UniProtKB/Swiss-Prot annotation:
Record protein name field: ATP-dependent Clp protease ATP-binding subunit ClpA homolog
Organism ancestry: Eukaryota, Viridiplantae, Streptophyta, Embryophyta, Tracheophyta
Compartments where located: Plastid, Chloroplast
Organism expressing this protein natively: Pinus pinaster (Maritime pine)
Function noted in UniProt: May interact with a ClpP-like protease involved in degradation of denatured proteins in the chloroplast.
GO cellular component, one term: chloroplast
Amino acid sequence: AESEAGDASPLVTEVLIGSPPGYVGYTEGG
């Protein structure tokens, strides 16, 4: 996915911001 910050914990980032599985990791960046 578009790894920008939360690439190490995709599951955490997806739940935190609620981003789709395709954009997992990019969520942590904002």
